[in-house]
Amino acid sequence: MSGVMDSGASDYQLEAAISKVFASENAWFVTDEAIQILAGMGYMKDCGIEKVMRDLRIFRIFEGTNDILRLFVALTGIQYAGGHLRELQKAVKDPISNFGVVFGEVAKRGKSSLGIGAGNALGEMVHPNLNDVAAQVCKNTEMFGNSVEKLLIKHGKQIIGEQFLLNRLAAAAIDIYATTCMLSRCTQSLNEQRPSAMHEELVTRAWANEANMRIAQNLGALKNPVQLDTFKMLSQISQNVCENNAPVQGNPLGI
């Protein structure tokens, strides 16, 4: 995030939103794990962790709640894809004059359907040790773009109300961005031959492996019939509770 600002970029609200969500949620997770390890001692003032946890909790609310920022992250990506689809729609109406645009899009989608991606666009930017991780980031980015386009084609402007889907999109985007940041940091360490470089590569690979699984799961949920049906059920459950202004089911003890 600091690197983006230092580069002179004037628009970094998306990166800022992702960084805020990622940092605040992971800081909470790490502190919670620390208290779990310390057991009862974690609650003692002398230890100091309980104060850290108390203060950290507000960060998921300050400067925009993380729930709202997740929607912002997803909708920002959708806004870009929507603009691309509108341009393509105009081109299709006059294919002769816009042959290059239409042909390029057909070729791109044809390659995608055959499993031929855009390649490793990050290959020249990362240390050779990390080429395979960078290639997976590119693949995940392409999967993300395809998922966004399919959602837009299916839901159109109504996508803004599909918050279960948007939340999965945001989670995938955050994981992709976080992995890219780790690649950048680790590449610098490897290039400068820092003493911690090999350890940082290990951390980067471990993170990327887990992130890849989460990304596949979140993007897969957007087209999984069982998952989509579950989203509808959860939406109906929420509606029932709101209409009842209380849990719908009675107390199991009959009280």
Task: Cite the ranges covered by each PLM segment.
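Flavin-dependent oxidoreductase catalytic core characteristic
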Residues: 1-255
